[in-house]
Amino acid sequence: MEQATQQIAISDAAQAHFRKLLDTQEEGTNIRIFVVNPGTPNAECGVSYCPPNAVEESDIEMKYNTFSAFIDEVSLPFLEEAEIDYVTEELGAQLTLKAPNAKMRKVADDAPLIERVEYVIQTQINPQLANHGGRITLIEITEDGYAVLQFGGGCNGCSMVDVTLKDGVEKQLVSLFPNELKGAKDITEHQRGEHSYY
């Protein structure tokens, strides 16, 4: 079993919360952090108990003050830059797990432009659009520097698409890739088709 070179950031409050939960379990139990459907739009992160007999040879161990976290090797790259916190609010406390790379593993700075733009869409833009039930797909980047996008989900047939494209998505992409992208174009036909909401 390997020791991890990079830790997942678990706040002191979250570590104390895990320790309290682990104290009720069989001795030697730790936690497991994992991603279901990693690298897809449906990726979901989770934390579970990891009794001693559930540790796999290929697991990566991250040691914290009072426990260890085990991560399977498939989930590991998708948990890069992940953060776990335990937030107390008026209505109670809850564990938060942010994993910006769960849906798509991080791409290198020198990766082809289309891969870097796709990464930004999946990790930054689509999570915002998901609040409205929408999503965008990158179709291609034209030779003259335009990202061609397809809107889907709740965005399809929505009259706000032009505003969303121009004000939100295009601005965000151009500001992140100022020397490489001139703008964004939409290939979705925004006539009200039978799949659209009225």
Swiss-Prot record:
Residues in coiled coil: none
Cofactor remark from the record: Binds 1 [4Fe-4S] cluster per subunit. The cluster is presumably bound at the interface of two monomers.
One GO biological process term: protein maturation
Record keywords, A-Z: 4Fe-4S, Iron, Iron-sulfur, Metal-binding
TM segment ranges: none
Tree of life domain: Bacteria
Essential cofactor(s): [4Fe-4S] cluster
One annotated GO molecular function: iron ion binding
Pfam families in UniProt: Fe-S_biosyn, NifU
Keyword Lipid metabolism among record annotations: no
InterPro entries: Fe/S_biogenesis_protein_NfuA (IPR017726), FeS_biogenesis (IPR000361), FSCA_dom_sf (IPR034904), HesB-like_dom_sf (IPR035903), NIF_FeS_clus_asmbl_NifU_C (IPR001075)
Binding site for [4Fe-4S] cluster: C155, C158
Family: Belongs to the NfuA family.
Purpose: Involved in iron-sulfur cluster biogenesis. Binds a 4Fe-4S cluster, can transfer this cluster to apoproteins, and thereby intervenes in the maturation of Fe/S proteins. Could also act as a scaffold/chaperone for damaged Fe/S proteins.
Known partners and oligomeric status: Homodimer.
Listed name of the protein: Fe/S biogenesis protein NfuA
